[in-house]
Amino acid sequence: MKLGILNGLGGKNISIDINRIKAAESMGYDSVWTAEAYGSDAVTPAAWILAHTEKIKVGTAIMQMPGRSPACTASTAMTLNQLSNGRFIVGLGASGPQVVEGWHGVAYGRPMTRTKEYIEIMRKIFAREEPVEHQGFHYSMPYQGEDGTGLGKPLKSMLAADTSIKIYTAAITPRGLETSGEVADGVFPIWMPPEKGDVLIESIQTGLSKSGRSLVEYDVAPFVTVMIGDNLEHCRMPIKGNMALYIGGMGARNKNFYNDYAKALGYEDAAIKIQDLFLSGKKDEAMAAVPDELVDACHLVGPVERIKERLQVWKEASSSGKIGSMLIGAGQQEALELVAGEML
C-alpha cells in the first residue's frame, strides 16, 4: 500500500502547509495531491510543493480537462517532471456540466470521448515519435475547423521524450471507471469502502482488458479522511459536511454523479434525502442526513484503537489488489503518523 496526502482546495485565500508535507515526506508518504474547482488552480501549488520538497511525488487531483488543451497539459507535465527529476503525476477529470459550461465556457460534450482523446494526444506528445496529428470529436490537431486559417501544421514537443509520466483520472461511474482502466494508469474513485471494491473493480478490469493489462499494473487510489478523537460525532461532522456537498449539491438534480455513486454503494434512500435537503437550502439538515455508516465505511474516525482496527480492513483490500494507494486527508499530525505507522 502506498500512502499519499491531500492538499485540498484553497478557499478565498490559498495556503500550503509545507511543514506538514515535509513531515509526511519524512514518514515515507509517496505522494501529495493538489486540487482545483473554480478558484485556485491545481498546477501552481503542485509546482510550489515540488520546489520545496526532495523525494515525495506531487500530483493533481484533479486538473479539469475542459479548462486546458491536451497539449497545454502535456507541456505542463513534461516541464514539471523535468524540473523535479521525475516526481510529477498527472491527475485529470472531466468535471461536470455546471462547472465546464458555467466557468470554462465550453460545451460539456462527451466526457468519455474527451478523456480518451485527451490522454491519447498527451501520450503522443510524451512519446515524441512523430508530429502530433489527431482528428476527433473534441480535438483537432492541426485545427481543421471552418473558422481556422489553415496554416496549422503537425508539431513535436521541443522537450525530450518522457513516457514515464503517469496519468490518473477521476471516475466513479461504470463508464468512467472502464475508460480509466482502458487508457489511464490509475483512478481516484473519491471515497471507497474497502469492502465494496468490487463495485468499482469489475468496470476497471473491463477497461484494463481492452488495453491488455491487469490490475497489478494499475492504481486504485481513494480519498480517505482521518480524524482522531474520542467524540465520534464530532469527528464525523466535517466529513458529513463534505459528503453532503458532493452527494447533495455537486451537480444538478438529474445529473449528480456523486449522488448516483452513493446509491450504487447501497445508500439510495439517504442519497435522495441528502439531495432534496441540500437543494432546498437546508444544508445543515443535509449534513445530518449523511449516515454514520457511510462515513465510517469510507473514512477513519474516532479513537486511535478504533482507527487501527479499521485499518486492518484497508490492509486486506491492499493485499487482494483492490486498492493500491490511500490518499489521506488529515489536518492532525498525529493522524498522518498513525496511518504511516500502521500501513508502511
Enumerate the predicted regions with their spans.
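Active-site-adjacent structural elements that line small-molecule/cofactor binding pockets in enzymes
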Residues: 1-344
